[in-house]
Structure formats: structure tokens, C-alpha cells
Amino acid sequence: CDIPQSTNCGGNVYSNDDINTAIQGALDDVANGDRPDNYPHQYYDEASEDITLCCGSGPWSEFPLVYNGPYYSSRDNYVSPGPDRVIYQTNTGEFCATVTHTGAASYDGFTQCS
């Protein structure tokens, strides 16, 4: 499905460019084998979270959604990933959803961004 023009994740509003930059950053990290920050990593679709993925079947990956991205952190320069993520189809980079830990039912759970 198409990347939305914007998304609201618990009050953080991201543009289409922010979302696209996050997906591209994730794909670049994988291609370069550069993952000291442990992102991207696999996303597990938990039925209890009621997240709608608008892309094809998995595997899916998640990557931090930040302003002025893409997100990058290293052992020597740790940067918090924040609460917001973009979910994409691991093999194709197709956009699936934006999700946030803000307001989720559990500490490590997600809720869908609007």
C-alpha cells in the first residue's frame, strides 16, 4: 500500500518523507551489514494488538520512526529509538504500517498510529 501523507503516533506527527526515510535507512543498514543499534529487527504481528498491516505476508521488520532521520545509534554513541516505528515487508521494503509504544496496553506492545 502507499505510504500515507502523514501519520500521528501518540502526538508525534511524521511526514511521508519521514516514513520513507526510515524505510530506506533500514534497507541501507541491512545492505551494509551495519546494525550496531539492533535495528531493523523482526516485527511479530500480535493479534491482541489489533494492528492492521496493509502490505503482503511476512516476514516484516520494524525500524524507529524519527524526525530528521534516519535513526542511527552505535555502541559508542547511543541514541534512544523513541516510541515510534515503521513496519515494512522485510524482503521488498513495502510499507505496512506505523505503530507506537505510546498508549499501548503493555510496556513492549504497540498500538496503531493514525
Swiss-Prot record:
Positions annotated to bind Ca(2+) 1: 29-30, 32, 37
Reactions catalysed: [RNA] containing adenosine + H2O = an [RNA fragment]-3'-adenosine-3'-phosphate + a 5'-hydroxy-ribonucleotide-3'-[RNA fragment]; [RNA] containing guanosine + H2O = an [RNA fragment]-3'-guanosine-3'-phosphate + a 5'-hydroxy-ribonucleotide-3'-[RNA fragment]
Positions of the catalytic residues: 41, 62, 101
Keywords: Calcium, Disulfide bond, Endonuclease, Hydrolase, Lyase, Metal-binding, Nuclease
GO MF annotation terms: lyase activity; metal ion binding; ribonuclease U2 activity; RNA binding
Residues annotated as site: Methylation inactivates enzyme: 62
Residue sites binding substrate per the record: 39-49, 85, 108-110
Record EC number: 4.6.1.20
Family label: Belongs to the ribonuclease U2 family.
Additional remarks: After treatment by base Asn-32 and Asp-45 partially isomerize by succinimide rearrangement to form isoaspartyl peptides.
Name of the protein in its database record: Ribonuclease U2
Organism: Ustilago sphaerogena (Smut fungus)
The gene coding this protein: RNU2
